[in-house]
Amino acid sequence: MEPAFGEVNQLGGVFVNGRPLPNAIRLRIVELAQLGIRPCDISRQLRVSHGCVSKILARYNETGSILPGAIGGSKPRVTTPTVVKHIRTYKQRDPGIFAWEIRDRLLADGVCDKYNVPSVSSISRILRNKIGNLAQQGHYDSYKQHQPAPQPALPYNHIYSYPSPITAAAAKVPTPPGVPAIPGSVALPRTWPSSHSVTDILGIRSITDQGVSDSSPYHSPKVEEWSSLGRNNFPAAAPHAVNGLEKGALEQEAKYGQAPNGLPAVSSFVSASSMAPYPTPAQVSPYMTYSAAPSGYVAGHGWQHAGSTPLSPHNCDIPASLAFKGMQAAREGSHSVTASAL
């Protein structure tokens, strides 16, 4: 008849997964082991897995008990206040001590035994969370005691510490008798200027500075005075000077100056009325007829030789007859316009 619950292992024994072995079987395993029977033989005889037999015997040799561990129970608390106190003492005596050294000292001093001594990770967590904060608080308190009193805040802008011109002027210029002095704490904070404004580029004071400086007996440049500094107030040049230079010196240099060969002198120039207008280039019609061969056409300059014709500017005859009717008409039209303009 098959059992109502449980499973059958490889040896034919019945076990319930997740449940401890009955105490009677546990006691029998220990008795057979004390008789000198090997664990593998005990496993075959009692039909219990070899791992279960080895685990029960190891726990009995370590603790002397055959009872199973707490099912679903929590591990007993090992970081008691007494242990934490001793760990703090060790850390204060030797700040560079390691967690494994603290664990060895707890065992050596008899604070803990091998069953309830905290692990290295637990000691590190205690040092980081509990003792570390206390050590930092103690260092902060000692630093705060030696720290001098904070200086009073300056009456400047809290964002940009820009010096106040009124305070600086009051520190340099003595106050004349009979005039009440402006205290430094009453000085208005100067706003942060814009680096692209005309006022800052020209160095003109702001409206706030002007309002305060109007009450002082000393003269300060106003905005109106800057407008008077125009070009019309500068002394005009003398009539006998050209561009700020003496006219006589220029004439003397022009008189003795010699120009290169083939070019007119500097002082001698031709009036505009006696010069002919520069001939405009002729507009060539895009539909002009061209009857000559490509090799017969010679490109010439705008100027013409004395003995040349319009069709042969280099005084050479073109064998083929060219029909430049559009060009000739445009050239005649430009000459007529030039003559009428003169």
Swiss-Prot record:
Tissues expressed in: In the embryo, expressed in pharyngeal pouches and derivatives, developing vertebral column, tail, head and limbs.
Location of region: PAI subdomain: 7-63
Gene null: resulting phenotype: Death shortly after birth. Mice lack thymus, parathyroid glands, ultimobranchial bodies and teeth. They show craniofacial and visceral malformations as well as malformations of their distal limbs.
Xref: PROSITE patterns: PAIRED_1 (PS00034), PAIRED_2 (PS51057)
Record keyword Transcription present: yes
Localization terms from the record: Nucleus
Keyword terms: Developmental protein, DNA-binding, Nucleus, Paired box, Transcription, Transcription regulation
MF-aspect GO terms: DNA-binding transcription activator activity, RNA polymerase II-specific; DNA-binding transcription factor activity; RNA polymerase II transcription regulatory region sequence-specific DNA binding
Cysteines engaged in disulfide bonds, as pairs: none
DNA-binding region listed in the record: 4-130
GO biological process: one example: endoderm development
Predominant place of localization: nucleus
InterPro entries xref list: Homeodomain-like_sf, PAIRED_DNA-bd_dom, Paired_dom, PAX_fam, WH-like_DNA-bd_sf
CDD domains xrefs: PAX
Segments for region (Interaction with KDM5B): 168-189
GO cellular component: a single term: nucleolus
Chain spans, region RED subdomain: 82-130
Biological role stated in the UniProt entry: Transcription factor required for normal development of thymus, parathyroid glands, ultimobranchial bodies, teeth, skeletal elements of skull and larynx as well as distal limbs.
Subunit structure: Interacts with KDM5B.
Name under which the protein is recorded: Paired box protein Pax-9
Organism this protein belongs to: Mus musculus
